Amino acid sequence: MIKRLIVISILLIVGTVLCGCMEQENVGQQNSEAQEKIVLKIFHAGSLSVPFEEYEKMFEKEHPNVDVEREPAGSVACVRKIIDLGKKADILASADYSLIPQMMMPKYADWYVMFARNEIVLAYTDKSKYKDEINSTNWYKILQRPDVKIGFSNPNDDPCGYRTQMVLQLAELYYKDPTIYDNLVLKHSNIKVEENNGTYLILVPKELDVDTNKLFVRSKETDLLAPLEAGAFDYLFIYKSVANQHHLKYIELPKEINLGYYEYADTYKKVALKIIAKNKTINAKPIVYGMTVPTNAPHKKEAIEFVKFVLGHPEVLENNGQPAIIPAVAYGNVPEELKDLVKIEK
């Protein structure tokens, strides 16, 4: 009897040890699998949040070993994270393609692809003042009313913000009314304008100071959506794609000023904007999005695969109200994996 008890006890001890070893082995395998998962970091413009969320889910489904992590922000802020703060990203997607050659090349990038278009519209809600009166011909007059508050993103951080300034300066030329930009922005901020022989240079100070009774400003354009819908201000200058994605009402602006059409490039270039903090001058031009894999990207192979995935699924952009450029136009040392999907320009 005693011998049987001893044998049973030994068997129980051995069984417990074996189970423990198996559990540790399983935990070890799970930890190993978790460690092997690649984190693909993407810095992208806020206006790309909706389509890139779709791309993230689609890409992860096809690549279960990859975890896509997105950091939306103003495009200038995205670039600054890389070139000023030393942060590493696998992909940079900007709402203004020119930021890549102007701010990143050649040290932080050696190629880029132009893959989507957009235009600026004036969005509003049922809470906006004079919503039943405003239209595509009187919008600039409605905005000048003293009880109307307008919103735009910070031109120091976000292309949508500096494009808004360009649109309003172009509006003065289009409507032949030199008071529009003055009354809407210049009188209510420390932004200045210099005029020289029919061309205009908008000067944006390092620290933007605005009259909050008239202007509502946040870092990136998508930060303004919730306040607009809550009635914190009345009208928002924003990309048409974002307005469509969030089911906002909006006024379409004339093609001559909305920065959406190549055929008006010569008109747009009458206006430029200088970001004093970076000593960068940006010419008004048609809105084109750009994407690159930074030279110090931790996971270049997977990053190029993601760019290839985006270029191969333009319908995601189109379905979200953002016209895709087909084929995409690429510049620089374009990776071999992308060459069949792009038109390479010198």
From Swiss-Prot:
GO molecular function: metal ion binding; molybdate ion binding; tungstate binding
Keyword terms: Cell membrane, Membrane, Metal-binding, Molybdenum, Signal, Transport
Membrane topology, from the record: Peripheral membrane protein
Disulfide bonds: none
Residues reported to bind molybdate: 46-47, 75, 158-160, 221, 239
Transmembrane segments: none
Signal sequence annotation: 1-19
Localization annotation: Cell membrane
GO biological process terms on file: molybdate ion transport
Family: Belongs to the bacterial solute-binding protein 1 family. WtpA subfamily.
Function: Part of the ABC transporter complex WtpABC involved in molybdate/tungstate import. Binds tungstate and molybdate.
Subunit (UniProt): The complex is composed of two ATP-binding proteins (WtpC), two transmembrane proteins (WtpB) and a solute-binding protein (WtpA).
Protein name: Molybdate/tungstate-binding protein WtpA
Species assigned in the record: Methanocaldococcus jannaschii (strain ATCC 43067 / DSM 2661 / JAL-1 / JCM 10045 / NBRC 100440) (Methanococcus jannaschii)
Source organism phylogeny: Archaea, Methanobacteriati, Methanobacteriota, Methanomada group, Methanococci
